[in-house]
Amino acid sequence: MSTNKERLIAALQEPLETTLTRYKTHLDGLKEDQVEENRDLYGENVITKGQEDSIIKKIYESIINPFTVILLVIALVSFITNVWLAKPGEEDPTTSIIIVTLVLISGGIRFIQELRSDKAASNLSRMIVNTATVLRDGSEQEIPIDEIVVGDVVKLSAGDMIPADVVLLDSRDFFVQQSGLTGESDAVEKACLAKADGQNLESLLESESLAFMGTNVISGRATALVLVVGDDTMMGAIEQTINTYDEPTSFEREMNSISWLLIRLMLVMVPVVFVINGLTDGDWLEAGVFALSVGVGLTPEMLPMIITASLAKGSIIMAKEKVVIKKLNAIQDLGAIDILCTDKTGTLTQDEIVLEYPLDIHGDLDLSVLRRAYLNSYFQTGLKNLMDRAIISRTEREAKKHDIVRDLDQTFHKIDELPFDFERRRMSVIVKDNDGFVSMVTKGALEEMLSVSNYVEYKGDIIPLTDDVRDEVLAEVAQLNEQGLRVLGVSYKSQLNENDVFSVEDESDMILTGYLAFLDPPKPSAAPAIKALAEYGVTTKILTGDNDKVTQAVCEKVGLDVTHILLGSDLDTMSDQDLAKAVETTTVFAKLSPDQKARIILSLKENGHKVGYMGDGINDAPSMKVSDVGISVDTAVDIAKETADVILLDKDLMVLEKGLVEGRKVYANMTKYIKMTVSSNFGNIFSLLFASIFLPFLPMAPVHLIVLNLVYDISCIALPFDNVDKEFLKEPHIWEAKSIMRFIAWFGPISSVFDILTYILLYFIIVPMILGHGYVHGSPEAVAFIIIFQTGWFIESMWSQTMVIHMLRSPKLPFIQSHPALSVVVTTLFAAVFVTSLPYSPLASLLKLSHLNGLYFILLFVIITLYMLSVTFVKHIYIKKYKEWL
């Protein structure tokens, strides 16, 4: 079988009939019985995104990350020092075993969450299907792109994603954006084989008659023959040879920043602890083991699992709310947006446009205007938008009562068309009636129709389009716009030659016959949704290509501030600095081109905003790409769905509000873990540094630090499912390493103060009371003193770490004003009780733990209570000073 390149070259060189015969197809498409044969012969239209990871690889990736690599190195060093280099009979692998167990538990939980996440993502991706229109057995069918086979004849129009590598059989003003393959930002015009001026066989990407999978139709229409599918396509070849690089999201960048910050801090603290203990005790081997254990205590090894669990849980919940997350990390970015830019149509309005009035130039009802509009909408083969459908629907209703609009599809047939594009903002069809008269009918934005018309028609008379008539038309249309009606102009020219080759230059010297007034009423949910988004700290800005008067009328009805509207023509004269100021004070932008929309979003981002963009059209794709979060709907054109990070199954701002809230919950619970864990761990390290300087022995055995870290991490498993205060959800939040360092600096030392208080009580009161004497270095009872002391701080550390979770998880009073999830209560209580019971369990001798007296537990209760009260007091000061919590 020929290679994909040979197939493409052959199609350019040989007669079309030869190509059709080779693939056993016809101009009217494949026969149904030939489809499966071609699929078996040439393969499926699916690009392999790299081989699916094996279970072994997934397990490896779940376990190995910067934090666990550090832990495994520590485990190895501990094994060498405590087992390999230990004296006979003194081998103790406990620390190494516990560290490895810690890594396996963290990795195992993450692996399970990743599997759940992958399954959820797979289920969600099946909800979003891109389709293509093919000819089979002579009739048009819309099928999923992955069902296309070599030999299929496909119909392409503006907004479509080209579904395979194809050769063009027929085309009209066909422009394709293929920057993803060539890097060329400008759209490229393509032509069918019969019209192409030669073919470039050296660089197939530059061929006029070939179009490639994954590129997008910007304007025009074409019929094409599928030559290459799936992995054999140009895009498939690229996917197989390079690793696709995705620009990290703001969330990913901040998480990487935080991870390396913690690693750097650990790399500083471990040597400091090692040197101090080595100089104090003189036992450098024991000091090394202890310093490594401190490293374990500083490592938030559950962070990857917490992130995965939070994102997976968020995506599943959001799917139930009709929000499909294409990229998991987009969940947090969605929650962080403070500005939502959106088009007007279908978002603020019902997306069910009704043609209210077909009017002549003086504003009187005129069915001849409807007649010509129908010819334009019915016979055009591009993307029939909502206004086309409204025109056809109104004509079908009127045809039951009026002969002038009856059987038009039988009375006329199409000769040619000039497809819509965003530069001209109009489209034309050339039709011939049964009497042989040929005419061009054009509809489009009124300003553009006036620019190509030199005459107007009124009650059958053709008169010049004078300035007075133009002013009358504009005044009439302005009144309609102020009522919220969208207006299109309709012009025509007749007595054309059907054998002519028509182009956009023929759209001139036309007769304006009238205009069409459409009603697209606001959604009942639009005003409440905009208000709700505002309550969550999100400003809604409207970016539309529509008329400013219509936009103003609709925006006023939904409660948006429209005291000032910025037009696309204004943007063209503004510098970047002027635009940066204007975007802050302007809510509504009208008559925009796609590039102007993207420029506004980039300006907002440069001003420090997190911007989401919601759209569903071809012209929305550039804006979605440059925004922080691209949002589309399942009914959008292919290019919009392909570009989006988030897809709504219901085009409603209320649905988006639910997704935004869930994104903030994900952020909140991940932030809780990071801030609470790191501040608590650093508090312990400061305590250890103090103890290393002033105590004649280690305050906690290395194995105690490891167990403490293991149990604490298990207690944090429920944090992704914790409740989040409603007040916290009202504002957008972004990740800041500076905020984490500030949090550590405020709350780490509080933990140290009460640890030191515990040292004093244990050293001078509790342990001497239990043993009947104080610490005597080198005495036989010194070992017992150390074990009891270490047991006391071991238990106090666990209680302080778990109970402070409830103090720090919310700025409010715990259990009274803010209630944690039951799972958080259960896991934290279990961790504290479990560690408290260890000295009385069979593990006591292995872990070198001892019983404690009743006075200890009374003082423990007092210390933990004072600690929680102190944290609450400092929390109040912190919030007052920095106006933030998590």
Residue ranges and their predicted role:
Residues E44-L76, D118, E140-Q141, L201-L210, ...:
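Soluble-to-membrane junctions at the N-terminal ends of transmembrane alpha-helices
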Residues T95-V129, R136, D246-I339, L516, ...:
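Hydrophobic alpha-helical transmembrane segments
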Residues L210-I218, D333-I511, F518, K531, ...:
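Cytosolic catalytic regions of ATP/NTP-dependent phosphoryl-transfer enzymes
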Residues M1-E140, D146-V149, V154-I162, V167-P248, ...:
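Non-lumenal N-terminal regulatory segments of integral membrane proteins
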Residues V273, P304, L311, V558, ...:
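Membrane-embedded transport module
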Residues A527-A529, E535, N547-V558, D595-S603, ...:
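Acidic, divalent-metal-coordinating active-site segment for phosphoryl/phosphodiester hydrolysis
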Residues I64-W84, V100-R110, V129-N130, W260-G278, ...:
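Alpha-helical transmembrane segments of multi-pass membrane proteins
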Residues V73-I98, L261-T299, A312-K322, V501, ...:
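Helix-interface capping motifs at the ends of transmembrane segments in multi-pass membrane proteins
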